[in-house]
Amino acid sequence: MEGPVLTLGLLAALAVCGSWGLNEEERLIRHLFQEKGYNKELRPVAHKEESVDVALALTLSNLISLKEVEETLTTNVWIEHGWTDNRLKWNAEEFGNISVLRLPPDMVWLPEIVLENNNDGSFQISYSCNVLVYHYGFVYWLPPAIFRSSCPISVTYFPFDWQNCSLKFSSLKYTAKEITLSLKQDAKENRTYPVEWIIIDPEGFTENGEWEIVHRPARVNVDPRAPLDSPSRQDITFYLIIRRKPLFYIINILVPCVLISFMVNLVFYLPADSGEKTSVAISVLLAQSVFLLLISKRLPATSMAIPLIGKFLLFGMVLVTMVVVICVIVLNIHFRTPSTHVLSEGVKKLFLETLPELLHMSRPAEDGPSPGALVRRSSSLGYISKAEEYFLLKSRSDLMFEKQSERHGLARRLTTARRPPASSEQAQQELFNELKPAVDGANFIVNHMRDQNNYNEEKDSWNRVARTVDRLCLFVVTPVMVVGTAWIFLQGVYNQPPPQPFPGDPYSYNVQDKRFI
């Protein structure tokens, strides 16, 4: 009898020692997953008609970037899951007062919540951290993730725009009959409230340098028209309404564009003889084309709207093109001559009298004789009459050799002076015959100079018409440029996000305005 008794006692002692070799967590895990027969493929419900309540919350750690060309929002978040699994309950006193158990996520049932509007084809969470299981059956999972979600970009008011991006979560594995999605609930002063916003921890949040978060609401969307077994029946969407910080684009794009566009007004100050009027205008046009090309690389290739900066550049390019045409017309007017064009009286009155007065242009001084010139002209008549008498009294030989005789000391002429003609008519006829070639030559010179003066005056009139057109276009183009620029950019300045996240809903969806249940 002693042998069997000793054997049984030894076996009992070995069993006790084996149980003592396991720690409390290992014993608890064996109890939950082996002894109770836990199956992670089955939903944690007692009846198949029941649904599992899954609560979600989103904590934003960093808004990494928003790529407009790809229409992709990249965020660093922590997505918080919470549900109850009655199969994972235990009595903490029986297992060394263990109230929380940390398990790998592949050991328990998961609701398989995925990001529907992802933009990289990765639906699952890349890093699977441990799941916290509490002794009363509550399961808590907080995995980190970097999501690349699609965000339709509205480029209408770029760079004074704001965007409404969202992260839409749902379960692609279970329908609305099997799980019920809801927002996480917190408690304050014994009152509970749903967390209807994206959580941001000020200490752990990194602010984005380009975008400012204006609203961050969260909402459970249920489509009553969709059947219960449809994946589109329910979802939880976290919205990010963000506003662009335009300082970078103002300094690097807008200010250079505006300055270059306004340089085209200097074309009207350049004289036409410089030959650089069209060159300056075309240079401005090329610079605007380069800026338009740079901006097109920053925005998505969409035909839904034209960005604000694109509107300004197109407006400027059209205006500069018109300035180039005006420069060609001004140069054509400036280099006109009386031999090719006739300056009509109507054009003279409009461009040489009316418009210069309205545009406050200084008129050139009239080419009239000065008072001194008039005195000299009147006194010259006496010299001419004395010269005529002198020529009448002197013979031709005396006139020809008068200087030579004085040079050789001959004070007396060898020939007798010619006497004046007997009659005045004969004298006048002789004088007329002698002076006619000189008078004809003088008349030819005077007529030629008069024609040349008229030619130059009319050419100067064409130049003045060109200057008047330049000044008129300066007074027209400058206000058009200023008003057009102000009208275009004021649209963006007054383009502000709505005061509330959802139109028609007065609730602000922020932590300061909790809705207690």
From Swiss-Prot:
It comes from the Eukaryota. This is Acetylcholine receptor subunit delta. Pentamer of two alpha chains, and one each of the beta, delta, and gamma (in immature muscle) or epsilon (in mature muscle) chains. The muscle heteropentamer composed of alpha-1, beta-1, delta, epsilon subunits interacts with the alpha-conotoxin ImII. The chain crosses the membrane at residues 246-270, 278-299, 312-333, 472-490. It is a multi-pass membrane protein. Glycans are attached at residues 97, 164. Residues 22-245 are extracellular. Residues 334-471 are cytoplasmic. Pfam families: Neur_chan_LBD, Neur_chan_memb. Changing residue 114 to L: Has no appreciable kinetic effects; allows for robust AChR expression. Changing residue 289 to F: In CMS3A; delayed closure of AchR ion channels, increasing the propensity for open-channel block, as well as a reduced rate of channel opening. One of its GO terms (molecular function) is acetylcholine receptor activity. Residues 1-21 form the signal peptide. It catalyses: K(+)(in) = K(+)(out); Na(+)(in) = Na(+)(out). It comes from Homo sapiens (Human). The modification Phosphotyrosine is found at residue 390. After binding acetylcholine, the AChR responds by an extensive change in conformation that affects all subunits and leads to opening of an ion-conducting channel across the plasma membrane.
